[in-house]
């Protein structure tokens, strides 16, 4: 007997531009077994980055009564339509106060629930702030207690109790939810290349070395270690030894429509300009910014916690640094750039990303989460 096609819903917030990418993968490779649809409560302006969802009800643009009414009606509709619910960052269809009840209903009806956590949803800002302020002690082996707030612990408890599968996007989160599965960020490789190549950018002058540091949030740049990074960058610039130009979107005092320091399209332009991209010095793992910058052919610098280095994929091309070694690592990279960088570097980096950070080559965890056989 032929298996009936199942329906999966992605929602209800799209962190890291996952939803359209995952849906595209299903359409291209699994359409005979799975139909993907999406619902989002948060919609970024198209000027930031154009993406699409099957259903949406923007929480910041919808009257609360209309929002609650739409969400409730969509929830009832979803019970009859979907077999699998893949929730990103802990956001479900109904309000957070009703999350436990909502997840319980899915479980009672035999629905498959996947909870997909990306970082700030279960790792508290207070913990990272404490880590940032005491990063030198942390590097010596000291830690700073609770990694999750009370509300996050409730979310974690709900996920453990009701979810069939829990995914985390950075391996440090496995310490918070030990039974979770690490699934790395993946890049829509060809789409990214096409979009970056279509963006204009400011050309470099001779012997100029351009360094980009762009924390995602202007208000929370300390969580990426921006203060420590700026201290090193300012020292390098002040030395006048190198012709350095800095691209620092979070430092620009401009009014923005979102909390992001730069739109994704602006980032594409910055990738084209930069020689070096610095990700973060606090969290302890690299993110989508690093992956994109590698594909763009840039030197990428990031901090990876010592205890997490065993989780790195083989031959990782990211230059590892912490707040103590960042200056030394940057000087080594600058000297290499001025001498003439390896002509094969870009190809090496792109091949590494294709192997370990594309959904075409890294999908086993998702197929397991969706309760599908591993072959596509």
State where each predicted segment sits.
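N-terminal subdomain of nucleotide-sugar transferases
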Residues: 1-49
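A charged, aromatic-enriched C-terminal amphipathic alpha-helix characteristic of glycosyltransferases
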Residues: 17, 339-371
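Short hydrophobic beta-strand element within catalytic cores of glycosyltransferases
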Residues: 299-302
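Donor nucleotide-sugar binding/catalytic pocket of nucleotide-sugar-dependent glycosyltransferases
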Residues: 138-140, 144-202
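Conserved catalytic-core segment of nucleotide-activated headgroup transferases in glycan assembly
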Residues: 185-262
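Membrane-proximal helix-turn-helix segments that form the acceptor-binding/catalytic region
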Residues: 73-80, 101-112, 132-165
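Aromatic "clamp/platform" in nucleotide-sugar-dependent glycosyltransferases that forms part
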Residues: 281-282
């Amino acid at each position: 007997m032929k298996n009936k096609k199942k329906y999966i819903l992605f929602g209800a917030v799209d962190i890291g531009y996952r939803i359209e990418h995952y849906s595209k993968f299903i359409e291209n490779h699994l359409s005979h077994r799975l139909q993907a649809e999406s619902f989002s409560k948060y919609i970024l302006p198209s000027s930031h980055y154009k993406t699409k969802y099957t259903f949406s009800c923007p929480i910041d643009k919808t009257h609360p009564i209309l929002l609650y009414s739409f969400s409730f009606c969509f929830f009832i509709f979803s019970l009859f339509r979907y077999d699998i619910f893949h929730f990103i960052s802990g956001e479900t269809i109904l309000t957070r106060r009703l999350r436990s009840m909502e997840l319980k209903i899915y479980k009672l009806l035999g629905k498959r629930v996947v909870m997909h956590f990306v970082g700030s949803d279960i790792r508290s800002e207070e913990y990272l702030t404490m880590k940032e302020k005491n990063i030198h002690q942390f590097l010596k082996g000291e830690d700073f207690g609770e990694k999750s707030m009370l509300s996050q612990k409730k979310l974690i408890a709900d996920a453990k109790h009701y979810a069939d599968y829990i995914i985390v996007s950075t391996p440090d989160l496995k310490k918070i939810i030990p039974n979770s599965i690490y699934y790395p960020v993946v890049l829509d490789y060809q789409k990214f290349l096409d979009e970056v190549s279509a963006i204009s950018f400011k050309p470099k002058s001779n012997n100029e070395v351009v360094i980009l540091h762009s924390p995602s949030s202007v208000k929370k740049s300390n969580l990426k270690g921006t203060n420590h990074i700026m201290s090193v960058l300012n020292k390098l610039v002040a030395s006048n030894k190198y012709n350095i130009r800095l691209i620092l979107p979070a430092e620009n005092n401009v009014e923005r429509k979102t909390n992001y320091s730069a739109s994704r399209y602006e980032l594409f332009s910055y990738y084209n300009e930069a020689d070096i991209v610095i990700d973060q010095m606090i969290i302890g793992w690299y993110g989508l910014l690093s992956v994109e910058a590698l594909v763009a052919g840039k030197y990428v610098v990031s901090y990876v916690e010592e205890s997490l280095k065993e989780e790195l994929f083989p031959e990782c091309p990211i230059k590892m640094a912490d707040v103590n070694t960042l200056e030394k690592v940057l000087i080594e990279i600058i000297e290499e750039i001025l001498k003439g960088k390896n002509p094969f570097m870009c190809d090496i980096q792109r091949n590494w990303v294709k192997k370990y950070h594309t959904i075409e080559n890294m999908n086993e965890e998702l197929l397991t989460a969706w309760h599908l056989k591993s072959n596509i």
